[in-house]
Design a protein with these regions (language model features):
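N-terminal amphipathic/basic leader segments beginning at the initiator methionine
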Residues: 1-19
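A non-catalytic, amphipathic alpha-helix used as a structural packing/dimerization or gating element
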Residues: 7, 11, 134, 171, ...
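Mg2+-dependent prenyl diphosphate-binding active-site environment of isoprenoid biosynthetic enzymes
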Residues: 17-252, 323
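Short, charged, amphipathic alpha-helical segments
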Residues: 129, 133, 289, 312-320
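Hydrophobic, well-ordered secondary-structure elements that form the walls
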Residues: 240, 298, 318
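Mobile late-domain/C-terminal helix-loop "cap" segments
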Residues: 253-305
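Short, amphipathic C-terminal "tail helix"
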Residues: 294, 309-330
């Protein structure tokens, strides 16, 4: 019998924390801080149900799902440091709770633990080396997407197009969010992932990230991230790019002047002005429609193929999770 999403989530959480114990209580607290905050664990759930849908064992699927959740947590620690973020999952970012060098080191430790977990799974015969190769792709592509995102902000680059955003976010977020879980599901059962998984998965992952950008402007504290934090961090979101393309010249000049300032120098009143302008400009509605279109195309291509997989009950859970991924409200 296939476990329920809540049962899988509980197992993931238990395994995550279980892999991060240490006799030094301060070190353990640093390692467990982000994993202990919970979260939806969507990526880990996707890996597990994709594995079961393809015929992989529950143990192998749990092992790989735990590794992807470890990836998510160490990447978030580094991302928060690089962006100067204030909050993560409704609480202060790790580098706001501890000195930054300790937070950075904790992220490095989680990265190492991810590879250690995968090597042990390989040595125990749970999966083959192609699973580790896929994790290398995850790290490589995410790092390149982060490079583009940071470079645009640090260089003050604002003359961007929607196509620039789509290329960046395909690497930074979409691959590890939707493509890798589907590919890992096939690899865990020693099958070759179809090209469809990357083609459709990128559309779903991009739709997810666009809605993440929307929620940063329209969300509330339940969302678990600093509201309008993307504006303080100067993120080049699809919404902002569209707004700058369409705004009157005076508004655009004022917005660009604000975005050129470092976070600590951005006046709150000016950030609020830009935030309100984005909400009423039509850029948010346009971005939502783009997300809806991409999600519809991605799901429309994937579901007929997923219906052919051997694990019918797991496939049903997988399809529900993919739908929830792109219909998120928080």
């Amino acid at each position: 019998m296939v476990p329920s999403p809540q049962e899988v989530k509980d197992a993931l959480h238990e395994r995550l924390l279980g892999h991060l114990t240490h006799p030094d209580p301060v070190y353990q607290a640093l390692l467990q801080e982000y994993p202990s905050r919970g979260g939806k664990m969507l990526r880990g759930l996707l890996v597990i149900y994709a594995g079961l849908a393809h015929g992989a064992t529950l143990e192998a699927s749990l092992w790989a799902g735990t590794a992807l959740e470890l990836f998510q947590n160490w990447v978030l620690i580094h991302d928060d440091i690089e962006d100067g973020s204030e909050e993560r999952r409704g609480r202060p970012a790790l580098h706001r709770l501890y000195p930054m060098p300790l937070a950075l080191n904790a992220g490095d430790a989680l990265h190492g633990e991810m590879w250690g977990l995968l090597i042990r799974g390989l040595n125990e015969g749970l999966f083959g080396p192609e699973v580790l190769a896929e994790f290398h792709q995850v790290v490589h592509r995410t790092a390149y997407g982060q490079h583009l995102d940071l470079l645009w902000t640090l260089s003050g680059h604002l003359d961007l197009t929607p196509e620039d955003y789509l290329r960046m976010v395909a690497h930074k977020a979409a691959y590890y969010t939707a493509v890798a879980p589907l590919r890992l599901g096939a690899l865990l059962s020693a099958k070759t992932p179809p090209a469809l998984y990357e083609e459709a998965g990128l559309k779903l992952g991009i739709a997810f990230q666009i809605m993440d950008d929307v929620l940063n402007l329209e969300g509330d504290q339940a969302y678990g991230k600093e509201l309008a934090g993307d504006l303080y961090e100067g993120k080049r979101t699809l919404i902002l790019i569209r707004y700058l393309q369409e705004a009157p010249k005076e508004e655009r000049i004022r917005a660009e002047a604000l975005l050129s300032l470092p976070r600590e120098a951005k006046p709150e009143a000016e950030v609020r002005w830009l935030w309100q302008n984005l909400l009423v400009s039509g850029a948010v509605a346009w971005a939502k429609e783009e997300a809806r279109r991409l999600a519809q195309e991605g799901l429309g291509a994937l579901i007929p193929y997923l219906d052919t997989l051997p694990g019918r009950e797991a496939t049903s859970h997988l399809q529900n999770l993919l739908t929830a991924l792109v219909e998120r409200r928080a």
